[in-house]
């Protein structure tokens, strides 16, 4: 029983001792708030509490793009967990809501200037990065200065990459890749076409060798030489509205072939396209006797001159033998028979044939103008022996025609009697003044004349006699002081009478040039007797007056033979 009495029993006073300890703890809070009655055991608790009164938030979020700030560090750490470990359940719910009803949500994000940007306008499946600013400096008041960047939205693309969508002043700009790709393809094709048309002389030869060389070898046809101004017979008989030049059709052929077609299919399509291409009107291709195609890489440079020397200068194509040019003569022969005139001279490599043809066939009034202005020629025949060779590549002058001495033609030019001017004047005469000249151009001719009308001169029309008798004019080999009149013995001073087809000494005429034979070789004066006046027997023979000899009158220096009969052609032949 004593044991039980010594056992202490709890009293209510013992239980009352615990609250004084709690009071003691309250009294031990030395850190009191200056703005309110709260006291804290630790200093950091007091500073955190004071920040609620001042609004200071020194703890900023370190995540890029986040601008949130906190007064407590524990709040910052809690906030960082949202960026580093977001809940996947919330994201899935948001995406499902956007897919089911994209227009129902009216969530907004803040813009650069504080304006709201509705996220419902964004395409489905896209997400927006909020407009966040990163502080880059602190002003003097201690405030942070931030950039205001534009929000960038990433829109999922069908090809698998994200396309940026920039927000500028509340207007969303979404680049349309389909339109851009289409425009870029069009610009690329246009640039390729322009580059090919500008570089046609360089690339045409390469493209023709690459595109179906065997198809060219299989083409059959006669020898055809196409010119821009003279289309081929096939194209002239059957005109086709869909015809195009061979160079353009060959160049545009590879552009129309898709890229996903295999190599044999491309070759088949190329052969089909080339079979559909008819003979062009502006190509300069030659089909030789071996059924092989030879195409000119530059049609403009060789369209005016078609000599074999120029055609051989370009060199043969790779894989295509050099064609023979023996069919050019047949081409020009056929053109001369059909059109009675040719536009080009096969043996000329310059513009002289073209310019001469244009001048001769353009109009008929130019020939009349040349009758009014006589054509002057050189007087020396020996200096002009190589005019046909030297003038082969030169332009012919319309006002001066140099003489061409010939050993097989008659030179029917007549000289003046003046000693000061030894010039030759051609006599022009056209049978039909208003009709254009249709004189064919021969392959052997080396140049074109300025006028194709009838000319007495044998330079243009050899072996033709004039239609009228020429005018009688005297010719003097010696000075007029030594010339004497002796009718009984005819002298060499009278030449230039009518020349007919009964001339006996043609070789002497050709050898002397334009000088005609003496009259005694043509006519016989043995039956003619002069009837001189008896008073004039002992008088010295007078000097011939060159101005009146053509009329048949001779006046002496003393003027005493005025009674003599006039010497005309009719009196001499009677």
Curated annotation (Swiss-Prot):
Q: Where is the composition biased (Low complexity)?
A: 97-119, 179-208, 265-276, 336-363, 376-396
Q: Where is this region: Disordered?
A: 1-29, 83-119, 175-250, 262-470, 547-574
Sorted alphabetically, the Gene Ontology cellular component annotations on this record are: cytoplasm; nucleus
Q: What are its GO biological-process terms? A: carbon catabolite repression of transcription from RNA polymerase II promoter by glucose
Q: Which UniProt keywords apply?
A: Carbohydrate metabolism, DNA-binding, Metal-binding, Nucleus, Repeat, Repressor, Transcription, Transcription regulation, Zinc, Zinc-finger
Question: Where does it mainly reside?
Answer: nucleus
Q: State a single Gene Ontology molecular function.
A: RNA polymerase II cis-regulatory region sequence-specific DNA binding
Q: What does this gene product do?
A: Involved in glucose repression of glucose metabolism genes.
Query: What name does the UniProt record give this protein?
Result: Regulatory protein MIG1
Q: Which gene encodes it?
A: MIG1
């Amino acid at each position: 029983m004593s044991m039980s009495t010594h056992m202490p029993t709890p009293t209510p006073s013992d239980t009352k001792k615990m609250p004084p300890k709690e009071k003691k703890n309250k009294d031990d809070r030395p850190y009191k708030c200056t703005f309110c009655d709260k006291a804290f055991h630790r200093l950091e608790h007091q500073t955190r509490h004071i920040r609620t009164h001042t609004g200071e938030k020194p703890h900023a979020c370190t995540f890029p793009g986040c601008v949130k700030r906190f007064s407590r560090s524990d709040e910052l750490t809690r906030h960082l967990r949202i960026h580093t470990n977001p809940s996947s359940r919330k994201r899935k719910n948001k995406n499902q809501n956007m897919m089911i009803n994209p227009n129902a949500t009216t969530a907004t994000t803040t813009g650069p200037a504080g304006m709201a940007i509705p996220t419902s306008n964004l395409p489905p499946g896209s997400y927006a990065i909020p407009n966040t600013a990163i502080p880059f400096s602190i002003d003097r008041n201690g405030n942070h200065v931030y950039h205001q960047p534009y929000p960038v939205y990433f829109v999922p693309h069908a090809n698998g990459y994200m396309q940026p969508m920039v927000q500028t002043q509340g207007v969303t700009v979404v680049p349309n890749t389909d339109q851009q790709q289409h425009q870029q393809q069009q610009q690329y094709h246009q640039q390729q076409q322009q580059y090919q048309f500008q570089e046609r002389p360089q690339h045409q030869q390469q493209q023709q060798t690459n595109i179906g060389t065997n198809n060219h070898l299989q083409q059959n046809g006669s020898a055809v030489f196409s010119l821009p101004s003279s289309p081929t017979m096939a194209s002239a008989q059957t005109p086709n509205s869909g015809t195009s030049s061979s160079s353009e059709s060959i160049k545009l052929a590879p552009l129309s072939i898709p890229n996903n077609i295999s190599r044999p299919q491309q070759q088949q399509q190329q052969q089909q396209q080339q079979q559909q291409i008819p003979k062009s009107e502006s190509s300069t291709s030659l089909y030789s006797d071996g059924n092989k195609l030879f195409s000119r890489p530059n049609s403009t440079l060789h369209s005016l001159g078609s000599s074999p020397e120029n055609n051989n200068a370009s060199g043969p194509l790779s894989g295509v033998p050099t064609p023979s040019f023996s069919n050019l003569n047949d081409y020009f022969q056929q053109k001369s028979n059909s059109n009675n005139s040719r536009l080009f001279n096969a043996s000329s490599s310059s513009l002289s044939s073209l310019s001469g043809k244009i001048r001769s066939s353009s109009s008929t009034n130019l020939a009349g103008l040349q009758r009014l202005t006589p054509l002057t020629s050189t007087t020396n025949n020996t200096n002009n022996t190589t005019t046909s060779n030297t003038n082969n590549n030169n332009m012919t002058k319309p006002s001066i025609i140099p003489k061409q001495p010939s050993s097989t033609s008659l030179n029917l030019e007549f000289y003046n009697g003046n000693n000061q001017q030894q010039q030759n004047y051609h006599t022009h005469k056209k049978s039909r003044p208003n009709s254009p000249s249709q004189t064919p151009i021969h392959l052997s001719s080396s140049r074109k004349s300025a006028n194709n009308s009838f000319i007495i001169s044998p330079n243009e029309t050899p072996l033709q006699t004039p239609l009228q008798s020429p005018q009688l004019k005297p010719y003097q080999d010696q000075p007029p002081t030594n010339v004497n009149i002796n009718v009984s013995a005819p002298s060499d001073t009278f030449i230039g009478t009518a020349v007919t087809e009964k001339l006996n000494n043609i070789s002497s005429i050709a050898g002397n040039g334009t000088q005609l034979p003496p009259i005694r070789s043509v006519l016989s004066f043995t039956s003619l007797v002069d009837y001189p006046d008896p008073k004039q027997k002992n008088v010295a023979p007078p000097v011939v007056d060159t101005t009146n000899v053509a009329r048949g009158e001779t006046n002496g220096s003393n003027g005493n033979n005025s009674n003599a009969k006039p010497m005309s052609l009719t009196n001499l032949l009677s």
